[in-house]
Amino acid sequence: MKTDFWLQRWSAGQIGFHQSEVNQDLQQYWSSLSVAPGARVLVPLCGKSQDMSWLRGQGYHVVGAELSEAAVESYFTERGEQPQITSQGDFKVYAAPGIEIWCGDFFALTVRDIGHCAAFYDRAAMIALPADMRERYVRQLEALMPQACSGLLITLEYDQTLLEGPPFSVPRTWLQRVMSGNWEVTKVGGQDTLHSSPKALKAGLERMDEHVYVLERQSR
């Protein structure tokens, strides 16, 4: 996704991708990762997701990455929190108990910036990116995450000849091809979400499959 497009969507309040409730798949499948309480959990392209508060409530330290200042500020304002704000290189970092959100270009983040994250959670990052950016996203994720880490990934798959993203379709075959060399990819859940998307129905799609994956980093 292009930077200007993402910032304009937040500026105009066009955030249909934002979920007002905690994601049910997160609540159902997160325990499959066996991540120790207190661990740092990376949430790429986090927006103002309610899911971050759920993870905080489970005892994790959330490390969010988000391009839009408006999104980050909304997250804290809606919770009545006043974060400590500091500048770290090209990033503005918003911090409060149990969370820090790095506001800036996700692809410019380094391990030195965010420290050791034991796991990641991606509900809306990979599907926000067009095909020509997705493999770059995977490689950046691998650069940020240590060996012996895990992640929960939620994607969509549909006929993109009938409907342009975002959210974009991420075929299972693509995911296996790009990630299976460094990750054990296990599908743990999923459902047809077609009838929850008026745009997809209008486009004439017959299915819009949601896939839920547990990813385990393979040690080298």
UniProtKB/Swiss-Prot annotation:
Domain of life assignment: Bacteria
Enzyme Commission numbers on file: 2.1.1.67
Main localisation: cytoplasm
Catalyzed reactions per annotation: S-adenosyl-L-methionine + a thiopurine = S-adenosyl-L-homocysteine + a thiopurine S-methylether
GO CC, one annotated term: cytoplasm
InterPro entries cross-referenced by the UniProt entry: SAM-dependent_MTases_sf, Thiopur_S-MeTfrase_Se/Te_detox, Thiopurine_S-MeTrfase, TPMT
Pfam families in UniProt: TPMT
GO BP annotation list: methylation; response to metal ion
Subcellular location, record wording: Cytoplasm
SUPFAM superfamilies xref list: S-adenosyl-L-methionine-dependent methyltransferases
Family: Belongs to the class I-like SAM-binding methyltransferase superfamily. TPMT family.
PANTHER family attached to this UniProt entry: THIOPURINE S-METHYLTRANSFERASE
Name under which the protein is recorded: Thiopurine S-methyltransferase
Organism field: Pseudomonas syringae pv. syringae (strain B728a)
Lineage of source species: Bacteria, Pseudomonadati, Pseudomonadota, Gammaproteobacteria, Pseudomonadales
